[in-house]
Amino acid sequence: GKTRNYAKPCLYEACLSPKGPSFVCLDPKGELLRDSGRLLEESGYEIRVLDLLHMEKSHCYNPFVYLTNDNEVQMLVTNLFKATTPKGAQSQDPFWDSTASILLSALVYYLYHEAPPEEQNFPMVMEMLRAGEVREDDDSYLSPLDVLFERLEMRNPEHIAVKYYKQYRSGSAKTLKSIQITLASHMEKFNLDSLIALTATDELYLQDMGEKRMALFALIPDSDTSFNFLVSILYQQLFQQLFDSADHKHGGSLPVPVHFLMDEFANISLPNDFEIKLSTMRSRNVFVSIILQNIAQLKALFEKQWESVLGNCDELLYLGG
């Protein structure tokens, strides 16, 4: 199939040349890592693995490590909400999602600007959310989280986290409770010990991608998509890292090409502007192989832009079905 006849040969061929590209492989079931990992390592590649099949064996991935400005915080929050919304789900009332994202923005901005590095992670976001108790029968009650933001406001009334928190806090106690429940439903996976351990620190060193030969494998279950949101965040941050590195550090083009092998492409929620990135990445020495079952999957993903996505692909490889 697609993996055996295209993805694996790409990896094997790279091992024959000392100038082979770096790889980012979406790897359902871990087949690519199992069959090519040792060969890549022996050929001089550094191997990193985000293993959502066996999280206790995975390298850790903390998205907070790669935040460099307030815009990237906003992108992280937006992408998390998009990736944790079930495909095809139509919210009856978008108010709850938009206000829940305002609360999440307040919490992430607080950690990004105020917390020590070891506390900047999603498990700490969950701790803060749990500290924000709301009493529906008492609008005047101040939770430990309210006190935290009050102190920050006294110190810096114009703080971006304070602005977002006040926006969230403007509703009644009953409304605030519903907002918290909405946010908790998007963040529920971060209650699991396995994901807490995986996202507490970072061992992926995404900043090295494009600087030296690396192979990053994202192992995902092919029958359960509930953790795929983490790969969506990884994609968004990787594209951001690679584009910034090419533009601001290397005069527009990465010294080591980076090839994304996106097997089961349809299973991952992509960054909002993926089709725009696709048209501009080649000049930066970043390449993508979109691997799908059929064109119908592409049409479902990019209802209006699917022809543009197809047009931005140099080659179309069709395997007989």
PLM regions: where:
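P-loop NTPase motor domains
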Residues: G1-V286, L301, Q305
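Conserved ATP-driven motor cores of ASCE-family P-loop NTPases powering translocation/secretion/packaging/pilus
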Residues: L278-G321
